[in-house]
Amino acid sequence: MKIDRKFNFQFNISEPKQKNNIVIFFLNTTQKLNDNYLTLTDAFSQNLVEVKEINCSGAINYLKVTNNSEKKLLVLESEQIIGDAIKQNRVVNSTTLIPEQSTVMLKVSCCEKNRWSPAVANTLSISKSLYFSKGRTSSSTDIFKNQKTDQFKIWDEISDKMKEFKSKSFTGSLEDIYNMKEDNFEEIVKS
């Protein structure tokens, strides 16, 4: 299937790959992508972005993001910012393009219910996994209607997903669900 949107960008969608209740479609293109921006993952790997709590107390729905790059920084809705350098793992509420050499307060939601403290290890990264589609849809609807997400609903949806995947997490972390099922995802990708 080929799609040509208003950005005049073409890509192919692969045939679905499925294992049990997981289906993956790959997007492929031969076109050179616009390179006047960095993704959050790329910026992290090049040490061009800083992500911190907004102050020492923190705020559940905001993170302070500093783009130290000479390029814009593209932060995608549903990306998970994970690690113990922040008080809890967060998921990005909406796609944001952060200007070069600037700092913004990024709207996020908590995706790790039972932790509110940083740790000594001071690790921080971007998850390989995005917030699941049902959760994204629900959050987007809440943002559209109320200009904010319903944090309790997000935690309930993550809890439901844990039950569905038969996974457990001491901190109620969305990332733990994906880590427990990573072998399944890797097997689908390799097939």
Task: Identify the residue ranges that each predicted region occupies.
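Short, solvent-exposed loop/turn segments enriched in Ser/Thr/Gly
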Residues: 55-63
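Mixed-charge (acidic/basic) macromolecular-recognition segments
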Residues: 111-191
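Generic alpha-helix detector with strongest preference for long hydrophobic helices that associate
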Residues: 5, 46, 89, 139, ...
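Short acidic, gly/pro-rich beta-turn/loop elements at beta-sheet edges
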Residues: 34, 75, 116-118
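Asparagine-centered strand-capping/turn motif at beta-strand->loop junctions
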Residues: 63-73
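Early extracytoplasmic/domain-onset interaction patches
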Residues: 1-54, 176-191
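Elongated alpha-helical scaffolds
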Residues: 72-76, 106
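Intrinsically disordered, low-complexity Pro/Gly/Ser/Thr-rich segments with frequent PxxP/GP/PP motifs
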Residues: 2-29, 80, 84-128
